[in-house]
């Protein structure tokens, strides 16, 4: 009873298409795709900026303790 079968998924998909329509779903899919692209681009930009800042850091002079 709690299992999700392919038949149940198809019925749910058909109901979603009936409620929203194909044009609205296409628009929603395009918006979702562009949002994911933007997120991935931001993540890659963040990684490259971290790498650049790590390369630009100059190591500090070593301090030795004299007794």
UniProtKB/Swiss-Prot annotation:
GO terms for cellular component: TAT protein transport complex. Keywords: Cell inner membrane, Cell membrane, Membrane, Protein transport, Translocation, Transmembrane, Transmembrane helix, Transport. The chain crosses the membrane at residues 4-21. InterPro entries: TatA/B/E, TatA/E, TatE. NCBIfam families: PRK01614.1, PRK03625.1, tatAE. Pfam families: TatA_B_E (PF02416). It comes from Enterobacter lignolyticus (strain SCF1). Residues 43-67 are annotated as: Disordered. It is a single-pass membrane protein. The keyword Transmembrane helix applies. It is found in: Cell inner membrane. GO terms for molecular function: protein transmembrane transporter activity. Its main location: membrane. Belongs to the TatA/E family. TatE subfamily. This is Probable Sec-independent protein translocase protein TatE. It comes from the Bacteria. Gene3D superfamilies: 1.20.5.3310. Part of the twin-arginine translocation (Tat) system that transports large folded proteins containing a characteristic twin-arginine motif in their signal peptide across membranes. TatE shares overlapping functions with TatA. The keyword Glycosyltransferase does not apply. GO terms for biological process: protein transport by the Tat complex.
